[in-house]
Design a protein with these regions (language model features):
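Alpha-helical transmembrane segments of multi-pass small-molecule/ion transporters
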Residues: 1-309
Length: 309
């Protein structure tokens, strides 16, 4: 009974936030603009603060380098497959974005924080930084020559100057350079971490509410949506097994790193994919795939929580 209560304490708030998002859309409690405001707060303030805090205070060891080295070829292979073979069967312009990046920013980091605490968020943040090496060129390619859309250089500049990227790199720089120790000696570190920690508190609830609000599954293209979702899940499940096997060969890798890799592979494809489409069909496909994979990843997270709790 105690184990059930422990798991329920993690899982019930997740589905409560999602259910409230669905209900809010049906009852018109909030508008799409309101939800975009929630997401903007998360991506520009809350999440960068959480990642900065985690990267600043983390004891980053060899396991972080191992995670980066193993995650990079995973998303690279996904992107190459989507460009070379995937679009032959599924002729959607934005298909590669679903396979070159997992939604570790909006969903992965908040879920990982729920389970292991904000101080461990850097483990997922490291993976988010790693995939950006592949995702940024893909975004540039998909967004090029689209009329009113930004040029590739503008998109790359926007990603590289995003609050999440800046705060991640700033936290890592202060940590690895030794500036963190100076801040601690001056008594500043505690003030900084308490402030950023306070600002990051609402991010999990806001993002899960947004997931429920934006859930959609169009009827016209359900066959392709389910096929692509199944393909994505199967591919990253195989990647997860391969990476876990490789981690057993590396000494000193702890359980939290393994869980971060596992959760990362079980996440949906990037929520940015719908916005990179060139047609209504592209948008519908990407939105549907993201919706299905979000439900699947949350179900897996519940199982994961029952094991870890």
């Amino acid at each position: 009974m105690d184990r059930f209560i422990t798991v329920a304490a993690i899982v019930v708030p997740i589905f409560a936030a999602i259910a409230l998002g669905i209900l809010a859309r049906r009852k018109l409690w909030v508008t799409a603009e309101n939800v975009q405001g929630f997401q903007s707060f998360v991506m520009k303030i809350g999440l960068p603060c959480a990642i900065f805090n985690s990267c600043l205070t983390a004891q980053i060891g060899a396991e972080s380098v191992s995670s980066m080295a193993l995650a990079f070829p995973t998303v690279l292979l996904g992107a190459l497959w989507a460009f070379r073979f995937g679009r032959r069967k599924f002729p959607y312009h934005n298909l590669p974005q679903l396979f070159c990046a997992q939604e570790s920013g909006m969903l992965g980091i908040p879920l990982y924080m729920l389970l292991f605490g904000a101080d461990q968020a850097y483990r997922m943040g490291i993976l988010d930084l790693t995939q950006s090496v592949v995702a940024i060129p893909v975004i540039a390619i998909l967004s090029s020559d689209t009329g009113e859309n930004p040029t590739p250089s503008q998109v790359v500049k926007k990603v590289m100057t995003s609050p999440l990227m800046i705060m991640s790199l700033l936290g890592l720089t202060l940590n690895l350079s030794g500036a963190k120790n100076w801040m601690q000696g001056m008594g500043v570190l505690g003030i900084v971490t308490e402030t950023t920690g306070f600002l990051s508190q609402p991010i999990s609830a806001l993002m899960l509410f947004s997931v429920g609000y934006n859930f959609s599954l169009a009827k016209g293209s359900r066959k392709h949506i389910f096929q692509i979702a199944a393909l994505h899940f199967g591919a990253f499940a195989v990647f997860a097994l391969m990476i876990q096997g490789a981690l057993f060969l590396i000494p000193g890798v702890d359980a939290l790193t393994r869980w971060a890799i596992f959760l990362y592979c079980m996440l949906p494809g990037s929520y940015l994919a719908p916005s990179l489409g060139r047609s209504e069909e592209d948008f519908t496909m990407a939105s549907g795939v993201c919706s299905i994979l979000t439900v699947v990843s949350l179900a897996i997270f519940c199982v994961m929580a029952s094991v870890v709790a």
